[in-house]
C-alpha cells in the first residue's frame, strides 16, 4: 500500500504551478483554439460569434483558476479572519473585460483575437450582464468585492443565484414593458457548481422544547447548491470567491408523503421548492412583504451560516475533521457584514445554531453574535424599511420567531432599566411593532444584534443617528459609524474610459489605480494647455463613440457637439426625474418663444427602470418619452434640444454613457438619497455635477470645492422647515409663470394629444401630495441650469473644472471605503502581499 502523503507533498500534487501561463499572444491563440475545439466542439466553419466569445472566456478563465486555487490554499495556511459580505443583490455586469483588466491580459487577448480575424470589442458585447441587482445596493456589493480582492482581504460574497435577474426593459409606445432576463440561457462560463457543498435549508415545521434543548421538527427541506465565481484583485494574484446559492428540491421531495399516489405530480411539484432562487424581486427602495421573498432571505442566510461554520471548524488545508469546537474565538475568525436588512435573519439564525445545535448558553451566544455581525443601513425612506408580519414568521420560521421574542424581551428589559417609566421609548425601540398586524422591524433587529451600524455617506449617517435610529444612538452611541460609499476605479475608469486613463497615466503614472488619492497630483495640471486639450479631446471622442452607438441601437441621430446632459438611475419620485422634465419643458418653451436666440445645444438623456408595480414611476417614463416625441419632432427646435430615453439602463450601458457625459444630474430632495454612487462615476469620468446637497454630493462638493459643482436647492434644514410650515405646491405654481406653463402643458395633453388625461395622476401628485417637493426647488434648479449653459459656452473654463473634479475624486474609491470597514468594523488590515503567480 502506498505511503500516505505528507501535507506539503499533497499540496505539491494539487498545486497548479506546472501549468504554463497564457500571458503571451501565441499562448492565448493556442488556448482559444483548444477551447473552441475541445470545450465547444466546433471548428471555424460552424462556430458562431457566441462560440468565439465562450472560447475566449474559457481562455481567460484558465488564467484565473491557478491563482484562485493558490489564493484559497494561502487562506487555509494563514487562517486569517474571514470577511463574509452577505447581500441579496450582486449587480456584477459583464465579467470578461474586467477579468482581462485585473489580470493584465487585455493586450495579449486583443492582439490574439486580431490575429484570429476577430474583433475583441464585438466579442465583449456578446456577454450577458449578470443583473443580479436592482441598482446602487447591488452594484456597491460588486465594487466592494473588487476592492476586497485588490486589498488582499480573505473575503467572500454570499448571495442568491437568481435564474432571472433584473427584468429587461423594453419601451413600447412610450411605456415600460418588462421582459424576463434569461441571463443563463447560453450558460455562464465564469461559475463553477459545487454540488459537494450542497446544504439543507429548513422551513415551516414546529418547535418542541425538551429537557435536552429545543428541537425544530417536521420541517420542509430545500437544498442549497453553491455556484462559485472567481473575483480577481487588480494585478495582485489574489482571487476571492463569490458563492451564490441555487435552490434544489431533495430527491424524496413530496414522495415521502405516503398519501401522494401521483409520482408525476410530486416530481412536477419540485418546481415549488426550486422557485426560491427563480427571480430577483425588482423593487428598489421599496418593501413588498411577500412570503417568497422572506424565503429567499432565510435561504441565503441559512446556507451561508452553515458554510461559515463548516469553514470555521475545519482547520488547515485538506483536513475535513472538525477541529475547532469552541466558539469563543468565532468573532476573531469571522466577520459578517449585512448589506441592508435583507440578510437580517443571520442574527436569529446564528443564535439558533449556537444555542440549539452547539449548546452554547444564551448570554455567551448573544455576545458572539453581536461581535460577529455588523449592519449597513442604505435608506431612510419609511416605505423601504422591512417590517415582516409576525403571522408569516409563525408559519415559516417558528423557532426564529421565538428567538426574536427572546432577543426583544432582553433588549426591552435593558432599556426599561436605563429609562424607567418611559413606556413610549419601549414602544419605539421594540423589535415587535404592535397594531392590527403585529410586525417585526428588521432594522431594529439589526441594530440590536450588531456591534457596528453604519450609514453610507456623512449626511446620511447623521440622519441615521438623529432621526431613523435616534433612540438606539442614545443607548449605544459608540456603535454608530459612517462609511462613505465608493466605486472601483478599475471598472469605472480603466475599463470604461481607457482614453482618459491613458492620458492620466502619461502624466502621473499608474499608481492611482490602486491609490486613487494620487489623482490629487492632477491639480498641478489645471492650467496646463496640453492636458486641457487632451481631456477635452478624450471627452469628445467618447461622445462621438456613444453617438454612433445610439444611432446603431436606437436609430436616433444626435448632435455630438451638444452638451450631453445625463440623468440615469432607478426611476423613483425621490430621485426627481420630474424636476428634470420640468426643466426640459421650460427650455423647449424658451426656444419656441424666441427661436432666433442662440441656445447651448443639449441632448438630455434619461434612463432607468421602474419597479413593475410602481405606477407613478411608470408614468414618469411615459412622460419622458412623450416629451421626447414632441421636442424631437419640432422643426423649430432642430438639434438644439433632444430628449432621449435610454432603454434598459444596466451596468454595461452605464460603462458607455458615463464616459460620454458632460453633465451629471443628482437632484434628489435633500435628505432622501443615502449616498448615491453614480454621482462618483460621473465625477471620475469628467462630467460636472448639477445636484442638491444630498448623499455623497455633499462630500464631493467638499473635496472639489462647491464652486466646481452646480449646487442648488433646499438643504436638509430647509426641507425640514418647509415640512414644519407645510409645503404648498400651488403657491409655487401661482408664483412662477414658466412652471405654471409647463405644468399646464402636461395636464392639458400638449404632450399626449391622443390621450389628454394621460398625465392627470402625475399633475395631481405634483400639485397636492408631492412628498419630494419638486416645485419648491424648480426656480433654483432653472437658474442653476442657466449657469451650466453659461460655463459650457466657455469650453476651456469648463474643462478646467472637469480636471479639478477628476483630481478631487480620490476619496470616492471603494478601496478607501473597504479599508475603513476593514480597520474600523472588521478588525483586519489590508495586505499588499502578492501571492506568487501559478
Curated annotation (Swiss-Prot):
Residues with the Phosphoserine modification: 15, 524
**Which residues does the UniProt site feature Involved in the association of subunits point to?**
109, 143
Record's superkingdom? Eukaryota
Site residues by UniProt (Participates in a stacking interaction with the adenine ring of AMP): 76
What the entry lists under Pfam families is as follows: Phosphorylase
Residue positions annotated to bind pyridoxal 5'-phosphate are 569
The Gene Ontology terms for molecular function here are: carbohydrate binding; glycogen phosphorylase activity; identical protein binding; pyridoxal phosphate binding
Q: Which UniProt keywords apply?
A: Acetylation, Allosteric enzyme, Carbohydrate metabolism, Glycogen metabolism, Glycosyltransferase, Phosphoprotein, Pyridoxal phosphate, Transferase
Q: Which SUPFAM superfamilies match?
A: UDP-Glycosyltransferase/glycogen phosphorylase
| Residue numbers of Phosphotyrosine PTMs | 197, 473
GO CC list: axon; cytoplasm
The residues that the entry says bind AMP are 43, 197, 310
| N6-(pyridoxal phosphate)lysine: residues bearing it | 681
Q: How does it assemble?
A: Homodimer. Dimers associate into a tetramer to form the enzymatically active phosphorylase A.
Q: Which family does it belong to?
A: Belongs to the glycogen phosphorylase family.
* Known role: Glycogen phosphorylase that regulates glycogen mobilization. Phosphorylase is an important allosteric enzyme in carbohydrate metabolism. Enzymes from different sources differ in their regulatory mechanisms and in their natural substrates. However, all known phosphorylases share catalytic and structural properties.
Q: What is this protein called?
A: Glycogen phosphorylase, brain form
Q: Which organism does this record belong to?
A: Rattus norvegicus (Rat)
Encoding gene (name):
Pygb
